[in-house]
A protein has these predicted regions:
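General N-terminal leader/first-domain-start detector
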Residues: 1-40, 45
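N-terminal regulatory/effector-sensing and dimerization cores
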Residues: 28-134
Length: 134
């Protein structure tokens, strides 16, 4: 997944959460003005190089988002609250529980699922290899 693809994936997640963007001087705040109790996600980025996402939100209704990762991409962060489920082609259905992580992803596809009333809280940094090679 290139960084641009990662940002498109994030936007699909935010739309599934019924969040809309508000551009700030230092990033973009995604939230639902009609339901502020559902939380928000703040995305700060240097286009083409890295993205920092801070999230604290509750899912309003079930949804899923497909993903396709071709180019190597590095993600690391801390997932403090929530329970994710995802399907990766060629692997059994998997889940994630709160943890710290660092993962290099390449040449995988699948789907991630979110479930109504699940609460998620975490922080993630995504890095393009172009940034790492500079």
């Amino acid at each position: 997944m290139s960084l641009a693809t990662h940002l498109k994936y994030q936007q699909a997640v935010f739309h599934g959460l019924h969040f809309t963007p508000c551009t700030l001087e230092y990033g973009t705040l995604w939230s639902n003005a009609k339901h502020p109790e559902r939380g928000s996600c703040l995305v700060c980025e240097r286009p083409g190089f890295y993205t920092l996402t801070v999230a604290d939100y509750t899912v309003a209704s079930d949804f899923s988002v497909p993903f396709l990762i071709r180019q190597p991409f590095l993600r690391f962060g801390s997932f403090y609250e929530g329970h994710t489920s995802f399907e990766i082609e060629g692997f059994q259905t998997s889940t994630s529980l709160p943890s710290n992580y660092i993962v290099k992803e390449a040449n995988i596809s699948g789907r991630q699922n979110w479930h109504e009333n699940e609460h998620y809280k975490g922080i993630e940094i995504g890095l393009s290899f172009a940034y790492l090679e500079k």
